[in-house]
Amino acid sequence: MLPSRASGLLIRSRHDDPAERRAHARGELVRVAPGRYVRAADWAPLRPEDRVVLRAVATLDRLGRTAVVSHVAAAAMWGMPLVGVPPSTTSITDPDRGRTHTGDHVTKHAAALSDVDLTRVEHMTLTTPARTAVDIALTASRSQAVAVLDHCLRARLCTLDEYWAALDRRDRRRGTSRVVWVGAFASPLAESAGESVLRVALDGLGFPPPQLQRPFRDEVGLIGYGDFWWDHIGLLDEFDGLKKYRAAEYRGGLSVEDVVVREKLREDRLRALPEVRGVVRTVWRDLYRPAEVAAALARAGLHRQRTGFRTLHRD
């Protein structure tokens, strides 16, 4: 969602308007920032990323447009994927602050800002994609950080060189090893946030790294690209985000039933290949149950290189 569209949804409260307070109490208005509301009917269908943008626009509408949108709020404005429940506060960066402070609606990050790390989107100033990815790597989970950088590389929002340069300009040294790990792990071949999160989970569980987007062909032609492929045992793991079934824009005019049949025929062709000895499917809900993912892969013959879930602590 662009800031201009978000701004068009805002209702700017008149001082102590009893009608607005009653509408809010009845659930007809959603309060997104002090003195800023949006109609519940407009709020309900918004994606989490769009809600983050709307809160950010509402917050800056009050703070003034000189504030710099950063972290998760900037990620949402760039169209980067958000993993899990996004924060309820809007992140801005203030180089004049001595320390980071989180209030009811705003998190003000204390960090140096270089002009090269800033850009304008419509009437708002926000951090560049590279700086945003670095900030996310410093403050969010590694799954979120990898999902963001994978997206940046795939969508060509930034390059790895720009990511490393943004890190070099960052004044904070604490947490640098996390940013380095994310940069080394990220790949433009991950086609969705779910694939990014699954890849991080597989690494944490100790499985060997898979080949990403491996092409498969038979006598008819190209079958498609496999999400995760372990050549040494002929195992394919396909991540199924379910959007291809539920969202009309991903079905290419096909019905849900037609998409299911198409996927079944595709999998039949994959299983018929001599190099494919097994196919495992993983969906979003499995990402919250890593032990079940590990068990499914183990049953298919994939052995861990490490035991136990590896965590990457903030340093």
Indicate residue ranges for each PLM-predicted region:
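Surface segments flanking catalytic/ligand-binding clefts of nucleic-acid enzymes
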Residues: 6-19, 65, 153-315
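Short gly/ser-rich loop at a beta-strand->alpha-helix junction or flexible surface loop bordering the NTP-binding
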Residues: 1-177, 211, 305-315
